[in-house]
């Protein structure tokens, strides 16, 4: 079957469902696609199609994730749903599916549960900027006061992790009723309310090309008579010939000028997000630039060595370590294109970290890396991946 052409007319937003096991994340995902495809076209996905999430690999880690898409009047959404709790942890930490916003599904019959809390914490740590709540299974709760109580608990939990609990949209409904075609307040109406909240509460994300220029250095060549060429894929922004750029990371930051941009052996006047380019630098020696540094718009990103991070440690079955690690463990941290050694400090109450755990850590690198909160990395030992992480907070 031919794939339908992707019409890029509406702005695109990435979202996903999070929340405790059996609170109805997958049922809600199916209900959203069912209701919205009837209204705005597209392809509905049944519960079992979503539940049989295919395996994918991100940073050497196998994750089960289901991807669905749907449209509202104003936007095109890509939505991820994970079958198991471990998949969520891995997904959010590796950034396999970057979310511009999350739909927290919480059963009105049960209230917030351990994974509800853990997913909110993870969302905070990995930088998911917005959360909308769908209070599910409201058809099973007759007591209005109980509903109010659950709503209050969820708001308090969000506020505890620095989300604006009081302003967060909370939609009451029943994914099951909506999926069965119920047109009432808790059925289809609730799904439309949710779609409306997605459209209005989650801002349209900045496109990569609109960000400040950043390109991780992959390779460096010296071309006689022309100077030094640095190759890589532009991560965000635009670089124009004649602009000043900084070389950041590993060594002290230096300023240089872009004197040429090449792509497929053709000269261009600029390179932009997504392009694989060679950038010619004026007056820069080949030994001044190395893999692992970045080229960036001056002042837009700084080098750091000390940060806190949320990490997932691979289990033995995933090819990770067979034994736990302890405080002051010194692996390599793979940022963008290179490894840097660093030491790990565990939280006070944590004596050791077992394969398969996720944990908050503090890291000190031996060399600075151009870094921002939300930057992903792999943890490696002698070239093999033993974990994945995301920078939560920069300390220095």
Swiss-Prot record:
Keywords: Cytoplasm, Elongation factor, GTP-binding, Hydrolase, Magnesium, Metal-binding, Nucleotide-binding, Protein biosynthesis. GO terms for cellular component: cytosol. It comes from the Bacteria. It is found in: Cytoplasm. Belongs to the TRAFAC class translation factor GTPase superfamily. Classic translation factor GTPase family. EF-Tu/EF-1A subfamily. Monomer. This is Elongation factor Tu. It comes from Paraburkholderia xenovorans (strain LB400). The gene is tuf1.
């Amino acid at each position: 079957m031919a794939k339908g052409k992707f019409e890029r007319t509406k702005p695109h937003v990435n979202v996903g469902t999070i929340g405790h096991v059996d609170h109805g994340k997958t049922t809600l995902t199916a209900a959203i696609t069912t209701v919205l495809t009837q209204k705005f076209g597209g392809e509905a996905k049944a519960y079992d199609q979503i539940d049989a999430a295919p395996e994918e690999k991100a940073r050497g880690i196998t994750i089960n994730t289901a991807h669905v898409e749907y449209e509202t009047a104003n936007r095109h959404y890509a939505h991820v749903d994970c079958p198991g709790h471990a998949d969520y942890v891995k997904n959010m930490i590796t950034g396999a599916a970057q979310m511009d916003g999350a739909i927290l599904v919480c059963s009105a019959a049960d209230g917030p549960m351990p994974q509800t809390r853990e997913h909110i914490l993870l969302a905070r740590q990995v930088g998911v900027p917005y959360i909308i709540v769908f209070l599910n299974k409201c058809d099973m709760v007759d007591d209005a006061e109980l509903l109010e109580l659950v709503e209050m608990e969820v708001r308090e939990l969000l506020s505890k992790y620095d989300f604006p609990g009081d302003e967060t949209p909370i939609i009451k409904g029943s994914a099951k009723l909506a999926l069965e075609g119920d047109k009432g307040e808790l059925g289809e109406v609730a799904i439309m309310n949710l779609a409306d909240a997605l459209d209005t509460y989650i801002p349209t994300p900045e496109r990569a090309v609109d960000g400040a220029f950043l390109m991780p250095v992959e390779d460096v060549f010296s071309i006689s008579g022309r100077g030094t060429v640095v190759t890589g894929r532009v991560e965000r922004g635009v670089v124009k010939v004649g602009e000043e750029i900084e070389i950041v990371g590993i060594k002290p930051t230096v300023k240089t000028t872009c004197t040429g941009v090449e792509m497929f052996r053709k000269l261009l006047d600029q390179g932009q997000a997504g392009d694989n380019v060679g950038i010619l630098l004026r007056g820069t020696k080949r030994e001044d630039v190395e893999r692992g540094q970045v080229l960036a718009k001056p002042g837009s990103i700084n080098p750091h060595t000390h940060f806190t991070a949320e990490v997932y440690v691979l289990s033995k079955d995933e090819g990770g370590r067979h034994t736990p690690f302890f405080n002051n463990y010194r692996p390599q941290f793979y940022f963008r294109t290179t490894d840097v050694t660093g030491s790990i400090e565990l939280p006070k109450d944590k004596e050791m970290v077992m394969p398969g755990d996720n944990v908050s850590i503090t890291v000190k690198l031996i060399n600075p890396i151009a870094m921002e909160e939300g930057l992903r990395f792999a943890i490696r030992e002698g070239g093999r991946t033993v974990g994945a992480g995301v920078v939560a907070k920069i300390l220095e």
